């Protein structure tokens, strides 16, 4: 974080997605739906979401100071692109592990598709994270329970999981393993321990 002071007030500007929560990303996505009269207005709102600097405060700065401040966030115009693997995430002392596509059930894929295919998919990032990353219980990844359980974990991730922690999981899953619904179910059916027995054909 970069520490900045404006009128004796202290603010902190993140330097990468590793310092930005999923909840903040959700707020940024909401800004994409708004119409602005100028780029300065839009930038001021991005600054408020990312740093807590009120739009009124940033718009009172000189143009040079405003440009200097906004330049600190140029990196956020693109999502993380580095190729890395996240094997585990610890939040409040609890270990969370990305789910393995090969052991996901058809029902779990349905839950993913529901949130991914909605027009408001950008608002569901925390819910997708809640399905893709789950707590480890007795050495195994916890099974999905119900919507209340998904929502509770989504709220936790929104507050405490960073975009840097989540985005590699999102990319690895949706760009790679989940290129199509049919492919997903075929991969899951072939690799997961089968519960299906064909008795007569």
Question: Which residues are covered by each model-predicted region?
Answer:
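Charged interaction scaffolds used for protein-protein
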Residues: 1-201
